[in-house]
């Protein structure tokens, strides 16, 4: 178990094998955090460029603040908290039963949900663009997030729920379920989109 604080220019932090860390991390440049094997991490992480990997039943409860973010959650791991990406793109990847449940604020979002993963984005922040791919059995839910332009790809037996004000481009399989709201213009509307 580690409790304290971490300050660095560049850092790499690993928590694994049922370990736990409750330390705020403040990193000026590149920060890589890996949490795996049923480990737990809780506290704020601030970094210019942040890479966070959560896997194998691990859990992270945190507020993430960065200029650029790459976040992956897989193998029944969980993330909960808040994400703010100030200038560049946020990349979220959730798969193999992993889950992301939190607020998002940023200009640009790229998300991929696969293998029964779930992304639940809360909050009503203004987002210029989002590209989202939802694979079979996965769920992407962001009904309050105010996204201008969406590029949405949804596979069979996957679900997506979004709000869009500009252009909503959809590539959906026949057994996909998509619901949307907002004053958007929909491209490639099919009968499984509501």
Task: Give the location of each predicted region.
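Extended, compositionally simple hydrophobic/Ser/Thr-rich segments
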Residues: 1-194
């Amino acid at each position: 178990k580690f409790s304290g604080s971490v300050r660095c220019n560049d850092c790499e932090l690993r928590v694994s094998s049922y370990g736990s860390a409750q330390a705020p991390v403040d990193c000026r440049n590149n920060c890589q955090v890996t949490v795996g094997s049923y480990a737990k991490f809780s506290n704020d992480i601030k970094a210019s460029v942040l890479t966070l990997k959560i896997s194998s039943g691990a859990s992270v409860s945190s507020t993430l603040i960065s200029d650029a973010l790459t976040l992956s959650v897989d193998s029944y791991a969980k993330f909960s908290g808040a994400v703010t990406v100030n200038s560049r793109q946020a990349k979220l990847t959730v798969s193999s039963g992993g889950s992301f449940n939190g607020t998002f604020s940023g200009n640009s979002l790229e998300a991929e949900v696969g293998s029964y993963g779930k992304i639940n984005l809360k909050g009503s922040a203004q987002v210029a663009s989002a590209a989202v791919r939802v694979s079979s059995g996965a769920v992407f839910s962001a009904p309050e997030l105010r996204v201008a332009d969406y590029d949405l790809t949804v596979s069979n037996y996957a679900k997506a729920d979004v709000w869009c004000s500009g252009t909503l481009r959809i590539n959906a399989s026949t057994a996909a379920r998509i619901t949307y709201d907002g004053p958007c213009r929909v491209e490639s509307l099919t009968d499984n989109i509501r």
